[in-house]
């Protein structure tokens, strides 16, 4: 636990040192959540803004909605976007997250290669190659990703894919890192779904 705290602290310090202005200027995300009320009518439950923060990595991120069971149930008025989770959802859970990938820095590139894998910790699948980049990690999830704006490179074990706005990715518990080699942030929407061990 101490190592995890140190890693998170290092990532936060890097973020504060190198990306504070960008993070403060990151636009909020409008979130609209609906439900069916007691009368059977569809209504808006929440219409608010999600603040993107840099608590988990140098990249501002905000959790839209989190579920913790399957089959899914409904929140009955609770704000499941405020549920605390780590990088991935819990067992039988889902996670809807927005991330702004900021342009990479030399400090990020020089972090130990296992930095992000240590953050993921027990949520990482057992199978997989060692990381080749400090932000490389894998989670025991199937991830749906939609690039909303900007461009980003998805690094895999021995290859990479350049992605632009409108591109989508389905990731099945594979090693990956998101690296923005451009000059503008890249916004990506992610839905992570808990999966079996690959």
Which residues make up each language-model segment?
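A short beta-strand-loop-beta hairpin characteristic of the jelly-roll/cupin
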Residues: 130-133, 137-139, 144-165
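Bacterial N-terminal signal peptides
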Residues: 6-18
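Double-stranded beta-helix
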Residues: 25, 30-32, 36-37, 42-46, ...
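Ligand-binding loop in jelly-roll beta-barrel domains
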Residues: 94, 151-153, 160-165, 173-197
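Positively charged n-region of N-terminal signal peptides that target proteins for export
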Residues: 1-5
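Boundary at the C-terminal end of the N-terminal hydrophobic targeting segment
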Residues: 20-23
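Conserved short histidine dyad/triad with adjacent acidic residue
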Residues: 49-51, 97-139, 172-175, 194-196
């Amino acid at each position: 636990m101490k190592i995890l705290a140190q890693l998170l602290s290092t990532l936060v310090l890097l973020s504060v040192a190198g990306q504070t202005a960008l993070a403060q200027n990151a636009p909020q995300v409008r979130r609209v959540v609906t439900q069916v009320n007691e009368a059977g009518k569809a209504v808006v439950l929440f219409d608010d803004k999600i603040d993107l923060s840099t608590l988990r990595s140098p990249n501002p991120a905000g959790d839209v909605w989190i579920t913790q069971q399957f089959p899914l149930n409904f929140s009955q008025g609770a704000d499941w976007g405020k549920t605390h989770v780590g990088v991935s959802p819990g067992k039988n859970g889902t996670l809807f997250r927005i991330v702004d990938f900021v342009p990479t820095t030399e400090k990020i590139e020089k972090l130990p290669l296992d930095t992000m894998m240590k953050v993921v910790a027990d949520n990482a699948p057992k199978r997989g190659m060692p990381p080749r980049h400090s932000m490389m990690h894998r989670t025991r999830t199937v991830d749906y990703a939609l690039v909303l704006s900007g461009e980003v490179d998805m690094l895999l074990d021995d290859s990479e894919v350049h992605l632009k706005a409108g591109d989508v990715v389905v990731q099945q518990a594979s090693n990956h890192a998101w690296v923005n080699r451009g000059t503008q942030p890249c916004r990506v929407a992610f839905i992570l779904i808990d999966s079996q061990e690959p």
